[in-house]
Amino acid sequence: MNSRNIDWKRAAIKHARRTGAHVTTPFETAMPLRGELLSKYAQFYATFWGNGHVPRRTLELCRRRIAAIHDCAAEWSIEDAAAALSAAEADQVRHGRFSTFTEVERAALAVAEKIPFLHHDIDDGDVERIRSGLGEAGTVTLMTALAFFDATARLRIIMNAPVHPAILTDTPLRDGELY
């Protein structure tokens, strides 16, 4: 897809949001036979970003790390603008270098590292480090979000989802689209 097509798609999405029309995103296109499942999935996914228990930046760091572990370009190409990740920070996340992040972010990223292929290696110490920074509700939210980030990356790979770069300026799924 060339840059002209991407610009056209972004303009179409903005127009649809202004007029109230629905825009089908690549992820939605891949799941046309189970609309009710997609709707429930999207509603649940949106709760992580909007409940305030985990900072959006922490969620975005973890989502991008899981995408990098899976080498899922379709998931990696979506950015949450509110997370304010610099190019250097995104590169650190891609390559598993976390020393410059906060203690809570490092704890979350350590667990995110294990979710895709080593989830049985998550121990009480890992969870306690998250709990000490995010509290009980934040820990539950983060652990659930990590599982959904993993599932989303896997679904994108299985469905051969196209790379559709997007910079989200609002909470993911605020308008119902799952990029």
PLM feature segments, named:
Residues 136-179:
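Preference for long, well-ordered alpha-helical segments
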Residues 1-56, 60, 80-84, 174-179:
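Mobile cap/lid helix-loop segments that border enzyme active or cofactor-binding sites
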